[in-house]
Regions:
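Beta-propeller domains
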Residues: 1-80
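Short, conserved, GDST-rich strand-edge loop motifs in beta-rich repeat architectures
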Residues: 7-8, 18, 125-144
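Short loop/turn segments immediately following beta-strands, especially the blade-tip
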Residues: 17-30, 74-86, 137-139, 149-162
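Surface-exposed loop and turn segments in beta-propeller and other repeat-based domains
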Residues: 25-46, 86-105, 162-195
Length: 195
């Protein structure tokens, strides 16, 4: 019954919160702003390129990616006007903060992601569009993409990469392959197959 919602702006790397006011007027505000980061090989600071956002089934957490920076973030949105950063992990990306995950070199950055219905498992893949992949992460052509699982703390907030799970699509038959969207048998947070 809530009128609150969120949308992500990819290139400016912002999250916009919108809601219907008590007088029935739609309002909006920018509630998350990811700063561009300097890079020695770029003439301008690198934007995060937030290609997706996701809200947990209990409306407690919002997840977002920064494909070029290389991080996934978790925000507590209990107060939708003031999201609080509660978790952040690094995997791949242009900033070089996590070039390897679980012993595998990551080509690309966190891109598509899917959350389990209980909110405890977030699966993240690294390919956006092949032309963009090839431009920003040319090594993905020969290495392929990966999928990692992030364990999410649904009580206190926080995220950790699961050290016992990684799918290396570079080793797939007829590969290397790229990975994009993930779906769960039985349902996930952005499909209605579980209804």
């Amino acid at each position: 019954d809530s009128t609150h919602g969120f949308c992500g702006a990819a290139l400016s790397t912002n999250v916009i919160h919108f809601w219907k006011s008590d007088v029935g007027k739609w309002e909006w505000e920018k509630v998350i702003d990811v700063e561009n980061e300097p890079h020695p090989d770029w003439p301008i600071p690198v934007p995060g390129v937030m290609s997706a956002i996701l809200v947990s089934m209990d409306d407690k957490y919002l997840y977002l990616n920064n494909w070029l920076h290389g991080d996934m973030r978790q925000y507590d949105i209990t107060d939708p006007h003031n999201p609080k950063l509660t978790g952040q992990i690094w995997m791949g990306g242009l900033l070089g903060r996590a070039p390897e995950v679980n012993g595998i070199k990551v080509a690309g950055g966190p891109q598509m992601f899917q959350l389990s219905l209980d909110g405890k498992r977030l699966y993240v893949t690294t390919s956006l569009f092949s032309t963009w992949d090839n431009q920003f992460y040319p090594e993905i052509r020969t290495q392929g993409g990966v999928m990692v699982m992030i364990d999410c703390d649904v009580e206190n907030g926080g995220m950790n990469i699961n050290e016992n799970f990684i799918v290396d699509f570079g080793k797939e038959p007829n590969g290397p392959s790229r990975c994009h969207e993930t779906r769960y048998p039985g349902g996930d947070c952005t499909s209605d197959i579980w209804l």
